[in-house]
């Protein structure tokens, strides 16, 4: 806590403040906390090594090191440094690619007693030369493949190449080099006003203080995974590194290729289960919180964030807005989003531990709450000063008038205290700006431009584009015309890419004030079309048209031609990433580095690659939101929900090899992630969890029945036992049994319906045949590439459920619910007992010839689909059987509709089924032709084949959900499953004729747990087997006599055959409104139009 003398000093300096304000300022700066002030960074790291040596410390791509391994390698390299003269406060330049080796190097420098100077490998040669010269680094640590970057650099120190073979022969124990927390740890160069960057000297104690902040305020633990995003030259990289390595967490290095692709970045975060990440707001704005599942804490820093960005993320993560200049060890204040953020800005928060904030006037007098002033910082994190810049150090690091004997850093930032103890950032007092999170002194950019032989005057200003992102504009005077490309090239030789102006404007002379200085207020605004000095050339092909469309959108400029320069029009690296991201939606791929090399469309087009989006091939793990059909399942609260399976039995006369089967199913369950689901109860909800590859992935049993004369009964009983053994909470949900018999082997597979459906079985049969064949021939099992995961489908479906496009469907379902009555069908008996054990079956089938007509000849008459015909027949049958003109049934669909752009689930295993109410309107049953067309049109009017009905019910956010009563309660369920036997018959196996116990098999026989409930009064399932259409009617024997259902079955067959015959006999194709995309047009109106056309032609 601040002591009383400090409080008195605050009172003395705040001459105009009230007593309440003095107390307020005292309270907000009361941040004193204990921290390991006498320990260095590497000592704190070594403490973590001793506590958790085998924990993963650092990960990069497929390489990782434990804390022990990282410590050993750093010790080995540190010994080399010591041998070569590195010691206390000596500087070592580090110019390495992002890699584990880079962080070994940093730790090694600290352990040797030195301080490191990070140098970005993408810096221009002149900037690298200046940093090495200015810092007088004794050594430069680099990598062999980067040596070419320093070929033309004059460096008097030692160049050390990081080589594993040289390092590993050294001793790996801790060194115990004498060191103090006030020793220099690193020097970071930032933009300077003199035309050259300046080095800021940071000591160990600032990071030692942050260690406790990470643990106590950010709640970072050894279980966290920290994303390493920032460039080594940016002090956020120090923050990320030691947030992990001083707390026992794991550091995950994210490479540039991933960062440059927003989609790839989101996938990486989810795959690696990153929990804490620090990002510039300019990057976060392009990410989607619905697609990033693992992040628990999101920290934005480097530039101002916006209320809309905070509100977008705050419900999904702990959102922290952090502020802090490099001169105060990275972070000085933080603000945590706890409620809806309104207004025009987001606070930068309150001081972190052992940090004091003072907002003062030019005389260092404290400003009152609400008054703007310069933000000054004191405390443990203050830098030692600027390297070899004593005058600048004394200007910026002044004696602290509030705490004798300490220093105060004058940030040059303008801010004010808010009544709630937070600080509002108001901008800069001087000409310093932030571009994409990097500090930029406008004077440095100006001084570089003035080096150009033809530029006599220049003024650089900052502006905001149509996306509210800052950019630089350089206005210059020159007697000669200077091409824009030449200016960009000249700038890039000395300035990092973020400091290169997006626009250049040439003037004959500068506007001046009465004092003869440049009048910045009179400088022209950049014209967003300025720079298009070439004649307009239109795009010549589809790809060029696509690029023009994207550039115009990203840059906010109209009429871009193929010769226009991306960067001359205001493009930058973030906008380049946006271009690449948007090309994804056109299935095109662009490397952002190519846009840097080829900045015009006519050049760039040759480097655009066709990229049919490749789905993520990694292992899917973690919590997954329930899909609508899964919500429906748990809502029913079936008596035994564990036993609600689908199963299949295969037969192979020559027998199966057990060892091959084990390899095959291991691969299948690894490949098809949904098969590893389990379901837990948590806080009154069901949570769906995709397990990884640990534990038992499936249960496999072998039965030798070769000497058993009663094999069929044993197979049925054992299958039934396995069916009943599935447990949703513990898994696995896949049960396999191999039955050896005298006449071959029977392979039984039971999978809980929550993770499999009819299409899934087709995929599994195909993969089983492929993998078994490969394994039999001693080949590596290689299944077709994964399509998008069930997890991704769930995420995207929830987003779609709340999209404007989807909400337009509400009108259809609203009308259906309000203008349709629930009609109950007749029953022979009244009962409340709807148990599965009372379910019985009646079936009908068509001949092979009749089925062939249905599949191949019928649809031509009215351009129908098979469901149009099957449901028309059902409508006629129900009218005849129950004397009902109009009834609502429940229709099941496969649910894999193409509603999500770029989502490919063609080979994804899971339960995707959709179900929705459909009206069978038979009021004109005397006109067969009309009824077929009416059924077709009614089905075509259903948006996206009905998938939206239960999306509205279960996924749409309550406040967006339309007022739908969901009161329709169909008693009849209809599901056409398609053709199954062709998917099972292969050269390896066929379908077994034996019973599988109680299951919901793909053939539609609905024998689940005997004590489970049957949801519908009648379940009607259609499927094709051995060339014949089969229709089964399942019913409760305590509600119906068998003869009653037989009547319905006979009526259905009779009407179906009549429809088949009618359509086959019809010579001409009769079109309906939906064939012309006129779904709202009634059939009668369509007939009137055709009549008028006929009259006009005669």
From Swiss-Prot:
<keyword id="KW-0067">ATP-binding</keyword>
<keyword id="KW-0436">Ligase</keyword>
<comment type="pathway">
    <text>Antibiotic biosynthesis; gramicidin S biosynthesis.</text>
</comment>
<dbReference type="GO" id="GO:0016874">
    <property type="term" value="F:ligase activity"/>
</dbReference>
<dbReference type="InterPro" id="IPR000873">
    <property type="entry name" value="AMP-dep_synth/lig_dom"/>
</dbReference>
<keyword id="KW-0413">Isomerase</keyword>
<comment type="similarity">
    <text>Belongs to the ATP-dependent AMP-binding enzyme family.</text>
</comment>
<comment type="subunit">
    <text>Large multienzyme complex of GrsA and GrsB.</text>
</comment>
<dbReference type="GO" id="GO:0008610">
    <property type="term" value="P:lipid biosynthetic process"/>
</dbReference>
<dbReference type="InterPro" id="IPR010071">
    <property type="entry name" value="AA_adenyl_dom"/>
</dbReference>
<dbReference type="GO" id="GO:0017000">
    <property type="term" value="P:antibiotic biosynthetic process"/>
</dbReference>
<keyword id="KW-0597">Phosphoprotein</keyword>
<dbReference type="InterPro" id="IPR025110">
    <property type="entry name" value="AMP-bd_C"/>
</dbReference>
<feature type="modified residue" description="O-(pantetheine 4'-phosphoryl)serine">
    <location>
        <position position="573"/>
    </location>
</feature>
<dbReference type="InterPro" id="IPR010060">
    <property type="entry name" value="NRPS_synth"/>
</dbReference>
<dbReference type="InterPro" id="IPR023213">
    <property type="entry name" value="CAT-like_dom_sf"/>
</dbReference>
<dbReference type="Pfam" id="PF00668">
    <property type="entry name" value="Condensation"/>
</dbReference>
<dbReference type="InterPro" id="IPR036736">
    <property type="entry name" value="ACP-like_sf"/>
</dbReference>
<keyword id="KW-0596">Phosphopantetheine</keyword>
<keyword id="KW-0547">Nucleotide-binding</keyword>
<dbReference type="InterPro" id="IPR009081">
    <property type="entry name" value="PP-bd_ACP"/>
</dbReference>
<keyword id="KW-0045">Antibiotic biosynthesis</keyword>
<feature type="domain" description="Carrier">
    <location>
        <begin position="538"/>
        <end position="612"/>
    </location>
</feature>
<dbReference type="InterPro" id="IPR045851">
    <property type="entry name" value="AMP-bd_C_sf"/>
</dbReference>
<dbReference type="InterPro" id="IPR006162">
    <property type="entry name" value="Ppantetheine_attach_site"/>
</dbReference>
<dbReference type="Pfam" id="PF00501">
    <property type="entry name" value="AMP-binding"/>
</dbReference>
<comment type="function">
    <text>In the first step of peptide synthesis this enzyme activates phenylalanine and racemizes it to the D-isomer.</text>
</comment>
<dbReference type="Pfam" id="PF13193">
    <property type="entry name" value="AMP-binding_C"/>
</dbReference>
<dbReference type="InterPro" id="IPR001242">
    <property type="entry name" value="Condensatn"/>
</dbReference>
<protein>
    <recommendedName>
        <fullName>Gramicidin S synthase 1</fullName>
        <ecNumber>5.1.1.11</ecNumber>
    </recommendedName>
</protein>
<keyword id="KW-0511">Multifunctional enzyme</keyword>
<dbReference type="InterPro" id="IPR020845">
    <property type="entry name" value="AMP-binding_CS"/>
</dbReference>
<dbReference type="Pfam" id="PF00550">
    <property type="entry name" value="PP-binding"/>
</dbReference>
<dbReference type="GO" id="GO:0047462">
    <property type="term" value="F:phenylalanine racemase (ATP-hydrolyzing) activity"/>
</dbReference>
<dbReference type="GO" id="GO:0005524">
    <property type="term" value="F:ATP binding"/>
</dbReference>
């Amino acid at each position: 806590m601040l002591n009383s003398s400090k409080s008195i000093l605050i009172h003395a300096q705040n001459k105009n403040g009230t007593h309440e304000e003095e107390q307020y300022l005292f309270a907000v700066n009361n941040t004193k906390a204990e921290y390991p002030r006498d320990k260095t960074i590497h000592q704190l790291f070594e403490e973590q090594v001793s506590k958790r040596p085998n924990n993963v410390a650092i990960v990069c791509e497929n390489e990782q090191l434990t804390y022990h391994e990282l410590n050993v390698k750093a010790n080995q390299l540190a010994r080399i440094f010591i041998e070569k003269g590195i010691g206390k406060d000596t500087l070592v330049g580090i110019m390495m690619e992002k890699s584990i080796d880079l962080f070994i190097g940093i730790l090694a420098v600290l352990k040797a007693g030195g301080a490191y100077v990070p140098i970005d490998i993408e810096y221009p040669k002149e900037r690298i030369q200046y940093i090495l010269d200015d810092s007088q680094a004794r050594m430069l640590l680099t990598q062999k493949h980067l040596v070419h970057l320093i070929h033309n650099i004059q460096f008097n120190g030692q160049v050390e190449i990081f080589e594993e073979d040289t390092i590993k022969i050294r001793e790996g124990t801790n060194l115990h080099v004498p060191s103090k927390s006030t020793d220099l740890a690193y020097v970071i160069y930032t933009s300077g006003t003199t035309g050259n960057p300046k080095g800021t000297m940071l000591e160990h104690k600032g990071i030692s203080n942050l260690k406790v902040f990470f643990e106590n305020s950010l709640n970072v633990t050894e279980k966290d995974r920290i994303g390493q995003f920032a460039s080594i030259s940016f002090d956020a990289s120090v923050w990320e590194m030691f947030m992990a390595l001083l707390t026992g967490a794991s550091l995950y290095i994210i490479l540039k290729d991933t960062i440059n692709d927003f989609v790839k970045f989101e996938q990486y975060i989810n795959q690696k289960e990153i929990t804490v990440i620090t990002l510039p707001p300019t990057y976060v704005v392009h990410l989607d919180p619905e697609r990033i599942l693992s992040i628990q804490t999101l920290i934005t820093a480097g530039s101002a964030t916006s209320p809309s960005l905070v509100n977008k993320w705050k419900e999904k993560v702990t959102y922290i807005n952090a502020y802090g200049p490099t001169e105060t060890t990275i972070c000085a204040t933080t603000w945590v989003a706890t409620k809806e953020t309104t207004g025009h800005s987001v606070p930068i928060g309150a001081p972190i531990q052992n940090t004091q904030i003072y907002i003062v006037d030019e005389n260092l007098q404290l400003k009152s709450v609400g008054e703007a002033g310069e933000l000054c910082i004191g405390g443990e994190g203050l830098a030692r000063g600027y390297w070899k810049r004593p005058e600048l150090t004394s200007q910026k690091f002044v004696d602290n008038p509030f705490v004798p004997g300490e220093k105060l850093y004058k940030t040059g930032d303008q801010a004010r205290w808010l009544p709630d103890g937070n600080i509002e950032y108001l901008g800069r007092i001087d000409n310093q700006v932030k571009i994409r999170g990097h500090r930029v002194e406008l004077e440095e950019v100006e001084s570089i431009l003035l080096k150009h032989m033809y530029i006599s005057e220049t003024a650089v200003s900052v502006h905001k584009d149509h996306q509210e992102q800052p950019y630089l504009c350089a206005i210059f005077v020159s007697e000669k015309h200077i091409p824009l490309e030449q200016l960009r090239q000249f700038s890039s030789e000395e300035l990092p890419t973020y400091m290169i102006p997006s626009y250049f404007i040439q003037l004959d002379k500068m506007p001046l004030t009465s004092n003869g200085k440049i009048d910045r207020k009179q400088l022209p605004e950049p014209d967003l079309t300025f720079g298009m000095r070439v004649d307009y050339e239109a795009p010549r092909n589809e790809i060029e048209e696509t690029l023009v469309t994207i550039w115009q959108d990203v840059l906010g400029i109209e009429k871009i031609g193929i010769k226009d320069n991306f960067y001359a029009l205001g493009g930058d690296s973030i906008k380049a990433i946006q271009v690449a991201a948007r090309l994804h939606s056109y299935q095109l791929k662009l490397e952002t580095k190519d846009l840097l090399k080829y900045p015009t469309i006519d050049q760039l087009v040759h480097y655009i690659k066709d990229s049919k989006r490749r789905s993520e091939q990694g292992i899917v793990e973690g919590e997954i939101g329930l899909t609508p059909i899964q919500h429906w399942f748990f809502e029913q609260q079936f008596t035994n929900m564990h036993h609600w399976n689908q199963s299949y039995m295969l037969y192979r006369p020559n027998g199966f090899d057990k060892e091959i089967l084990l390899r095959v199913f291991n691969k299948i369950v690894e490949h098809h992630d949904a098969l590893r689901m389990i379901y837990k109860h948590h806080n009154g909800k069901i949570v769906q969890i995709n397990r990884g590859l640990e534990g038992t992935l499936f249960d496999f049993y072998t039965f030798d029945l070769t000497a058993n004369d009663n094999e069929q009964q044993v197979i049925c009983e054992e299958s039934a036992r396995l069916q009943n053994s599935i447990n949703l909470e513990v898994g696995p949900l896949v049960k396999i049994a191999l039955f050896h018999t005298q006449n071959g082997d029977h392979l039984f597979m039971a999978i809980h319906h929550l993770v499999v459906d009819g299409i899934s079985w087709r995929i599994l049969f195909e993969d089983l045949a492929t993998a078994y064949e490969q394994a039999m021939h001693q080949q590596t099992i290689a299944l077709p590439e994964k399509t998008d995961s069930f997890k991704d489908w769930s995420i995207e479906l929830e987003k779609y459920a709340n999209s404007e496009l989807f909400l337009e469907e509400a009108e259809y379902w609203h009308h259906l619910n309000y203008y349709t009555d629930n009609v109950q069908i007749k029953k022979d008996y009244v009962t409340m007992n709807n148990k599965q054990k009372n379910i019985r079956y009646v079936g009908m089938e068509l001949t092979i010839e009749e089925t062939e007509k249905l599949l191949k000849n019928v649809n031509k008459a009215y351009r129908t689909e098979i469901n149009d015909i099957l449901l028309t027949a059902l409508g006629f049958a129900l009218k005849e059987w129950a004397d009902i003109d109009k009834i609502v049934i429940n229709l099941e669909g496969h649910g894999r509709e193409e509603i999500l752009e770029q989502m490919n689930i063609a080979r994804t295993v899971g339960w995707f089924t959709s179900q929705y109410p459909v009206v069978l309107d038979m009021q004109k049953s005397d006109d067969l032709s009309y009824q077929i067309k009416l059924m077709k049109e009614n089905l075509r009017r259903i948006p996206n084949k009905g998938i939206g009905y239960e999306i509205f019910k279960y996924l749409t956010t309550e406040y967006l959900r339309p007022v739908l009563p969901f009161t329709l309660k169909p008693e009849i369920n209809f599901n056409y499953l398609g053709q199954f036997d062709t998917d099972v018959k292969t050269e390896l196996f066929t379908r077994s004729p034996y019973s599988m116990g109680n299951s919901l098999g793909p053939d539609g026989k609905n024998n689940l747990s005997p004590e489970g409930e049957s949801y519908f009064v009648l379940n009607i399932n259609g499927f094709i087997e051995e060339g014949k259409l089969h229709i089964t009617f399942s019913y409760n024997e305590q509600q119906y006599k068998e003869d009653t259902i037989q009547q319905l079955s006979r009526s259905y067959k009779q009407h179906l055959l009549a429809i088949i015959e009618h359509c086959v006999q019809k010579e001409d194709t009769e079109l309906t409104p939906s064939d012309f995309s006129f779904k709202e047009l009634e059939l009668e109106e369509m007939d009137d139009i055709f009549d008028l056309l006929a009259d006009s032609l005669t």
